Curated annotation (Swiss-Prot):
It catalyses: 4-CDP-2-C-methyl-D-erythritol + ATP = 4-CDP-2-C-methyl-D-erythritol 2-phosphate + ADP + H(+). Disulfide bonds: none annotated. Pathway: Isoprenoid biosynthesis; isopentenyl diphosphate biosynthesis via DXP pathway; isopentenyl diphosphate from 1-deoxy-D-xylulose 5-phosphate: step 3/6. InterPro entries: GHMP_kinase_C_sf, GHMP_kinase_N_dom, IspE, Ribosomal_Su5_D2-typ_SF, Ribsml_uS5_D2-typ_fold_subgr. The active site is at K6, D137. Keywords: ATP-binding, Isoprene biosynthesis, Kinase, Nucleotide-binding, Transferase. Catalyzes the phosphorylation of the position 2 hydroxy group of 4-diphosphocytidyl-2C-methyl-D-erythritol. One of its GO terms (molecular function) is 4-(cytidine 5'-diphospho)-2-C-methyl-D-erythritol kinase activity. It is an enzyme of class 2 (transferase). This is 4-diphosphocytidyl-2-C-methyl-D-erythritol kinase. ATP binds at P95, V96, C97, A98, G99, L100, G101, G102, G103, S104, S105. Belongs to the GHMP kinase family. IspE subfamily.
Amino acid sequence: MKAYAKANIFLKLTGFDSRKYHLLESRFILLKDVFDELELVDKESDSKKEFEIISNFKCENNIIQKAYLLLSRRYNNELKELFSKKSLKLTKNIPVCAGLGGGSSDCASFLLLINETLNLKLNLQELINLSIQLGSDIAFFLSGFHSANVSSCGEIIEEFEDDIPNLKWTFPQISCQTKAVYDEFDRGIFDFQKNNNQAQIYKKLSTKELLQNFKNKELNDLFTPCATLYPKMKSYLQEDFFLSGSGSSVFKVDR
């Protein structure tokens, strides 16, 4: 099963919820050319792990492990039987700490894979309700939408009929830590009401219109704090690249 990456075309921070998590308004688009792959493979006879992930990526305590534990609360016997014979193979291609949602997409694909394999018959809303307990962005990947306006903490998704130009991507060898970038944003000067007003305009425009008519700093509230924390990102900010998420992946319209 393919776990596709995403890009944020705009990302506006609009407040905090009761847990002090940031509220956002964003346009997510699916990147069909950038993906990880998940599959169930026969378990090696000498493996002692109850749930084993085989990967080219360090997987201890990652979000898939958390999803497995969450599902185990309701489907412990079914999962134990499945993973007594199978291991999960995860092939990572999506750059890590790059603002492309790789971990969230992997988690969504794992939930879909288990739902299908064990015939759990969980509907989309039930899967989204599970995903809210695991992290943001997962709901978008569960939806299967190619483009959507996403709000709150990532769990409210509205499909958007979009016009998406070809994008040319650059993946800097810079690991941008999401929490650090958000913390840097919080140290700056911001106006949540202004951000929300801008977001309401952006939500009505196509991706093509957004990238043609607005500057990178206007579209993504995290670009300036990202460049402050990671000075090598400043050149991309100055050269009119657009930032996905909290970085470090950047893009331009491929003209």
